[in-house]
């Protein structure tokens, strides 16, 4: 678990969502947000890009009518986004504090950022917990490569499982390798297109990050 910050101004649970470019981080946010809202969570979203706010624009388009676009903020880091969430998170901390002040009734902030392959982690000054997203298209061997992000994340998401047959990847092997490198740390397999694993991912967020009672599968309102 990422160490909690001692910043007394922090009011809202902060979750980092990181992973390699193209792994599906933005898609994960887009599919879990409506479910979180349905379950009574009031989320805010911050995305990180080097010289654009394209991810934020994409999320705003996808979540139009679901989440007020003012609750989605893009940060232009001017450098590798992983630096802005790990070595020097001051820009993101400022963005978080701005959002907390503007929307004090919110109870969750998701901070999305890409990183250098498997090395991305989030500063404990920025995120209380973080999720790391990899995808099957990167290859069956990805879990065996370890990397701080993959190994230390509070939840590992293995995304795009529908692509396994097309890239010759065995999900059984990926799961087995994941258990070896992560030990007892949780992981989940997901498919954003079909929704496979998404409700379960939200259950994990609710239970382990927000410390909220989770109803058994099939009983969600």
Curated annotation (Swiss-Prot):
Record flagged with keyword Nucleotide-binding: yes
This protein's UniProt keywords: Chaperone, Cytoplasm, GTP-binding, Nickel insertion, Nucleotide-binding, Virulence
Compartments in which it is found: Cytoplasm
SUPFAM superfamilies documented for this protein: P-loop containing nucleoside triphosphate hydrolases (SSF52540)
Protein residues bound to GTP: 19-26
Chief place of localization: cytoplasm
GO-annotated molecular function: GTP binding; GTPase activity; nickel cation binding
A Pfam family this chain is assigned to: cobW
Family annotation (InterPro entries): CobW/HypB/UreG_nucleotide-bd (IPR003495), P-loop_NTPase (IPR027417), UreG (IPR004400)
Gene Ontology biological process terms, A to Z: urea catabolic process
Annotated Gene3D superfamilies: P-loop containing nucleotide triphosphate hydrolases
CC terms in the record's Gene Ontology section: cytoplasm
Entry keyword Lipid metabolism: no
Similarity field: Belongs to the SIMIBI class G3E GTPase family. UreG subfamily.
Function of the protein: Facilitates the functional incorporation of the urease nickel metallocenter. This process requires GTP hydrolysis, probably effectuated by UreG.
Subunit structure: Homodimer. UreD, UreF and UreG form a complex that acts as a GTP-hydrolysis-dependent molecular chaperone, activating the urease apoprotein by helping to assemble the nickel containing metallocenter of UreC. The UreE protein probably delivers the nickel.
NCBIfam families reported for this sequence: ureG (TIGR00101)
Matching HAMAP family: UreG
Name the UniProt record assigns to this protein: Urease accessory protein UreG
Gene of this entry: ureG
């Amino acid at each position: 678990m990422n160490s909690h910050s001692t910043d007394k101004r922090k009011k809202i649970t902060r979750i980092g969502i990181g992973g390699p470019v193209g792994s599906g981080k933005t898609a994960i946010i887009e599919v879990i947000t409506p479910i979180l809202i349905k379950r009574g969570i009031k989320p805010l979203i911050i995305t990180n890009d080097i010289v654009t706010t394209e991810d934020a624009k994409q999320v705003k388009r996808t979540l139009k009518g679901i989440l007020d676009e003012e609750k989605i903020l893009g940060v232009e880091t001017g450098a590798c986004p992983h630096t802005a969430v790990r070595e020097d998170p001051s820009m993101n901390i400022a963005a978080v504090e701005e959002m907390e002040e503007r929307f004090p009734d919110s109870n969750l902030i998701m901070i999305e950022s890409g990183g250098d392959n498997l090395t991305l982690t989030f500063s404990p000054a920025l995120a209380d917990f973080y999720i790391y997203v990899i995808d099957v298209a990167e290859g069956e061997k990805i879990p065996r490569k370890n990397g701080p992000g993959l190994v230390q994340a509070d939840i590992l998401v293995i995304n795009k499982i529908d692509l396994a047959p097309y890239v010759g990847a065995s999900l059984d092997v990926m799961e087995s390798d994941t258990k070896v490198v992560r030990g007892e740390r949780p992981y989940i397999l997901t498919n954003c297109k079909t929704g496979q694993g998404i409700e379960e991912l939200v259950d994990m967020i609710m239970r382990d990050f927000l410390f909220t009672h989770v109803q058994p599968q099939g009983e969600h309102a």
